[in-house]
Amino acid sequence: MSRANPPSNSSGSRKISFNVSEQYDIQDVVGEGAYGVVCSAIHKPSGQKVAIKKITPFDHSMFCLRTLREMKLLRYFNHENIISILDIQKPRSYETFNEVYLIQELMETDMHRVIRTQDLSDDHCQYFIYQTLRALKAMHSANVLHRDLKPSNLLLNANCDLKVCDFGLARSAASQEDNSGFMTEYVATRWYRAPEIMLTFKEYTKAIDVWSVGCILAEMLSGKPLFPGKDYHHQLTLILDVLGTPTMEDYYGIKSRRAREYIRSLPFKKKVPFRTLFPKTSDLALDLLEKLLAFNPVKRITVEEALKHPYLEPYHDPDDEPTAPPIPEEFFDFDKHKDNLSKEQLKQFIYQEIMR
């Protein structure tokens, strides 16, 4: 292992050290997050361009949990529309193990950057949503909820290939354990959160990811977020401003009495037709959007149904939309016991996962 030539970040104000194998020639910083930095690199033996994600998770249990989920799930899925881990840098020893290096496919940009800088054609919207749903079909068939789908987690390259990334908040859909700990860790961007996440704390289904896809489609169609809430209350207000006050059936579908009382305290709102909000959009796109953004998760379209929707007909191929086997029950064992695990125990889990 070598201390590879450290890249400067864009401001050039500080150096970032990358302790990776000499097989990699580190190039540029391409992204930074709360507990990590991503650099582009060239794998010298093959000439392949890669992304190396350096993570320093060991200061916080939450970062350790996210890193563990990310490593385990990205290794589990082998799918064209889910970012893959090509390699993980093995540490010299447990004692000197302070950083995690994930070597991944290099993608050129992400949906957030693309939406900010250009208008997308209807054809682009179709192809991008199709690929997102194709990835989601694999996740949901494996009983995995992504829980943090948003434009910046959809990576893109010049041929318009799309890959979903960041599985740090993912969890098992099969798990029936109480979700009360879910919100404490749920720092996901509020704008793409399904209304049921804010209205009850008990059960989350695959429908939460479908809602996020609806928000992403709306943003691709208009160039701006559909529900850019400033806080919890504002978020719900924006959703109801568009969808209108829930019907009695949907109202009684809300499990939490407090949430029902809160909705009842709000002024009555009429539904705004999507045609008014998206005047230039095709009828088929709006029809799919309506179905993705159904207020009631029980009535929301499933991923399989969405893939069959006429809007995606140019791309839909039932023989080329693979599923993944359901994750084994013990896969998320560390999550079930997360409140009792020390940072040192989590570090051991991460080390074992890298060395396996």
Swiss-Prot record:
One of its GO terms (molecular function) is MAP kinase activity. Its cofactor is Mg(2+). It catalyses: L-seryl-[protein] + ATP = O-phospho-L-seryl-[protein] + ADP + H(+); L-threonyl-[protein] + ATP = O-phospho-L-threonyl-[protein] + ADP + H(+). Pfam families: Pkinase. InterPro entries: Kinase-like_dom_sf (IPR011009), MAP_kinase (IPR050117), MAP_kinase_CS (IPR003527), Prot_kinase_dom (IPR000719), Protein_kinase_ATP_BS (IPR017441), Ser/Thr_kinase_AS (IPR008271). Residues 24-312 form the Protein kinase domain. Disruption phenotype: Impairs the formation of appressoria and the ability to infect rice plants, even when inoculated onto wounded leaves. Leads to decreased transcription of the cell surface sensors MSB2 and SHO1. Blocks the transcription of both virulence genes GAS1 and GAS2 during appressorium formation. ATP binds at V30, G31, E32, G33, A34, Y35, G36, V37, V38, K53. The keyword Phosphoprotein does not apply. Its EC number is 2.7.11.24. The keyword Repeat does not apply. Keywords: ATP-binding, Kinase, Magnesium, Nucleotide-binding, Serine/threonine-protein kinase, Transferase, Virulence. SMART domains: S_TKc. One of its GO terms (biological process) is positive regulation of appressorium formation. Belongs to the protein kinase superfamily. CMGC Ser/Thr protein kinase family. MAP kinase subfamily. Mitogen-activated protein kinase; part of the MST11-MST7-PMK1 MAP kinase (MAPK) cascade that is essential for appressorium formation, penetration and invasive growth. Central regulator of appressorium development that acts downstream of the cAMP signal. The MST11-MST7-PMK1 MAP kinase cascade transduces signals from the cell surface sensors MDB2 and SHO1 that recognize various surface signals such as surface hydrophobicity, cutin monomers, and rice leaf waxes. This is Mitogen-activated protein kinase PMK11.
